[in-house]
Amino acid sequence: MTESTTSDVVLTSEQIAGLLPHRYPFALVDRVIAHDPGVSATAIKNVTMNEPQFQGHFPERPLMPGVLIVEAMAQVGGLIVTQMPDLPKGLFVFAGIDGVRFRRPVVPGDQLVIRCELLSLKRKRFGKVKAEATVDGDLACSGELMFSLVD
């Protein structure tokens, strides 16, 4: 995937809320810094100690749960598939994962940079994206995510 060289905000949290159904505490995309609708997106997730999962995961050594890293990547992927032209109305839901690997811990204070690229769209209902999340340029998580359109 290509490295974004801009720090400009392309989509604000308010604009993201207009595109995705997720709300606090499950809205995991803070801003989008690069977006080619229907093709790719790069977004930021600022990880803070104030997030509810850190009360129990783990109090003495807080780590962002891997499932939430994957969900953050899926939300960025959702920004891509929901912006595809000529798609029927409905809700794209997270439908599967392939080859996901966790490479480093993500802790409060980290900033996840999440990049997703559309790999395929079949029958205007099933999408697949390649996703990766990095912290300070180091790969934290990567894999392929699938989406399905529900009417």
From Swiss-Prot:
Primary enzyme class: lyase
Source taxon at top rank: Bacteria
Active site positions: H57
Cysteines paired by S-S bonds: none
GO function terms (MF aspect): (3R)-hydroxyacyl-[acyl-carrier-protein] dehydratase activity
Any one of the GO CC terms: membrane
Record-listed E.C. numbers: 4.2.1.59
Keyword Repeat belongs to the record: no
Reactions mediated catalytically: a (3R)-hydroxyacyl-[ACP] = a (2E)-enoyl-[ACP] + H2O
Predominant location: cytoplasm
InterPro entries linked: FabA_FabZ, FabZ, HotDog_dom_sf
The keyword Cytoplasm appears for this protein: yes
Gene Ontology biological-process entries: fatty acid biosynthetic process; lipid A biosynthetic process
Function: Involved in unsaturated fatty acids biosynthesis. Catalyzes the dehydration of short chain beta-hydroxyacyl-ACPs and long chain saturated and unsaturated beta-hydroxyacyl-ACPs.
Family label: Belongs to the thioester dehydratase family. FabZ subfamily.
Protein name in UniProt: 3-hydroxyacyl-[acyl-carrier-protein] dehydratase FabZ
Species this protein is from: Synechococcus sp. (strain CC9605)
Gene expressing this chain: fabZ
